[in-house]
């Protein structure tokens, strides 16, 4: 297909017009081509992509009078009005009797700056007859529409002063020039046939049979179209919403809690010992503040830690430190939210989940960040069992698209029995995605909870890495536009 065959009729009209005049403004091109200015410029830009014309742009500055500037063209600038009034040295007080104090104030500075007068002991002394200044000539040159500096015969210094005085205003206009290139000129001289072409086969053309006598515009199927990047939800946010929707469909209530928690709810209520490495292993962000402990629970929790309370448990032994429990931290897991919710709702049945951010002092690398999302959930009912927990988690992962799910024994301070759910991923094998179990009586008893509680905490970011095929967790939080554009909207 020749270049000429690939030109639309509008492109040909523009090219022929430019062959005659060489270059033109959009308005001149409209006149010579017979096209509307928008259609002419659209054709010009298409010709530019083909190398047949060039489109240059420059900013053109024009100026017009403000309302105040227009008024001064009739009455004269404040300094001109006062200098014309001055026939002899006159006190400023007397001037304020003839002119407004505001005008006298404005004029005084400009009279001195221009050398038209001087101030001696509160008296304005004229310097003699003065000719019109450049600024006055510039104001007088304004008539009608906005003008350039050249059109009003002014200079940058004068116009700058008038802008500062808010007597004129600047308008910036984009000025385009379309010029034919050597390649475009060579093509135009070969002769361009102006023939109407049909770009779309419509039902009307088919019904009437008129398509038989029409020439259709040829299409090139070998050209790759430009990529279009429409707006879409961030892939990580989309996965979080998918998880949220799954639990809502399973009848769970979503709960929220503060990111600042006391050590009591973050550690002690979950039966994590105060002098055990379990706390240090969390790499906690400790805050320089404390809070009051819940009076209805802390003594029972303290007794559970020290000697096992009123149940068949030995506790952790040692003395429980109330002040240590009052210290605030950035929550290291969202379990602090769910256990607090259970304390407020100790009666069965309860089905609640929380998808929110947790914080740990981690070194940033491809698999760790100091901030991460966690999916926490609890189910409390007198008929619940460990088998129900496994079935519930398996159902969740199946709905997330993982066909094979298994569970391995695990250990957590606040659940027994405990498991770690794993899913099978091609190329990676079995991947662990969190922890789960049944709350120990050491956790539930001090809070007044009598029925079994199934609990789990699942790693959202790790699951997202598997679903999105990422090897670097940091991509989920970075503004990598190329990755975001190429990310899948959905997977079937």
Swiss-Prot record:
InterPro entries per record: aa-tRNA-synth_II, aa-tRNA-synth_II/BPL/LPL, Phe-tRNA-synth_IIc_asu, Phe_tRNA_ligase_alpha_bac/arc, Phenylalanyl-tRNA_Synthase
Catalytic activity: tRNA(Phe) + L-phenylalanine + ATP = L-phenylalanyl-tRNA(Phe) + AMP + diphosphate + H(+)
Cofactor entry: Mg(2+)
Predominant subcellular localization, coarse grouping: cytoplasm
UniProt: L-phenylalanine binding residues: 335, 374-376, 414, 439
Biological process, per Gene Ontology: phenylalanyl-tRNA aminoacylation
Binding site residues for Mg(2+): 416
Cofactor binding note from Swiss-Prot or TrEMBL: Binds 2 magnesium ions per tetramer.
Enzyme type, top EC level: ligase
Keywords, in A-Z order: Aminoacyl-tRNA synthetase, ATP-binding, Cytoplasm, Ligase, Magnesium, Metal-binding, Nucleotide-binding, Protein biosynthesis
Coiled coil regions in record: none
One GO cellular component term: cytoplasm
Subcellular location: Cytoplasm
Single Gene Ontology MF annotation: ATP binding
A Pfam family this chain is assigned to: tRNA-synt_2d
Entry EC number(s): 6.1.1.20
Family annotation (CDD domains): PheRS_alpha_core
Assembly with partners or alone: Tetramer of two alpha and two beta subunits.
Family annotation (PANTHER family): PHENYLALANINE--TRNA LIGASE ALPHA SUBUNIT, PHENYLALANYL-TRNA SYNTHETASE
Similarity remark: Belongs to the class-II aminoacyl-tRNA synthetase family. Phe-tRNA synthetase alpha subunit type 2 subfamily.
Protein name: Phenylalanine--tRNA ligase alpha subunit
Gene field: pheS
